[in-house]
Amino acid sequence: MGRKWANIVAKKTAKDGATSKIYAKFGVEIYAAAKQGEPDPELNTSLKFVIERAKQAQVPKHVIDKAIDKAKGGGDETFVQGRYEGFGPNGSMIIAETLTSNVNRTIANVRTIFNKKGGNIGAAGSVSYMFDNTGVIVFKGTDPDHIFEILLEAEVDVRDVTEEEGNIVIYTEPTDLHKGIAALKAAGITEFSTTELEMIAQSEVELSPEDLEIFEGLVDALEDDDDVQKVYHNVANL
């Protein structure tokens, strides 16, 4: 499945801890999910999943409640999902997933970031075909064979189950992520550090220090944009 999840999550954790924007971005995602269905997570599986992810990211309860209350109060903002793909230096690729109430603003901002930070924005599909949309489940554990048996019995379509640094890391088909979570909960596993849909690069590149500095600036600028929810790339040494 490419580089170890421990390496990916170390970078994600460092970025999450370095910015206060993560709370605001989860607030938008929770609001959007609540607006698209019932504002009750027990009646809205999409909302329930976002809230679970927010809790894993240690988003405070008051941030979650505020977003749901805003949706209940009839907030009139409509958010649209988007995906932008492009290239950095020396074979590096990048995908930015967005959630925005103003598509024109987002397109302009993302294009400007690519242009100013040494990248080139591409057409839809120009990069994403080199990534696999994958369900990722991570929790504390050291027996991947036992976990694989649990998932197999529940007929979950699993790509891989590994043990990394005291964690079980499960990669599923994207359509079976929720089924996998349900199977684990039924087996008594209820504490997860990650339950995400991720775009994982099929192959990776290593950049020189000079190119890495440029690419990191591009990634950081995209992640700092209010409308960008997730950034994926294929650089092994970032």
From Swiss-Prot:
The gene is yeeN. GO terms for cellular component: cytosol. It comes from Escherichia coli (strain K12). It is found in: Cytoplasm. Keywords: Cytoplasm, DNA-binding, Transcription, Transcription regulation. Belongs to the TACO1 family. YeeN subfamily. GO terms for biological process: regulation of DNA-templated transcription. Signal peptide: none annotated. InterPro entries: Integrase-like_N, TACO1_YebC-like_2nd/3rd_dom, TACO1_YebC_N, Transcrip_reg_TACO1-like, Transcrip_reg_TACO1-like_dom3, Transcrip_reg_TACO1_YeeN, YebC-like. Pfam families: TACO1_YebC_N, Transcrip_reg. SUPFAM superfamilies: YebC-like. This is Probable transcriptional regulatory protein YeeN. GO terms for molecular function: DNA binding.
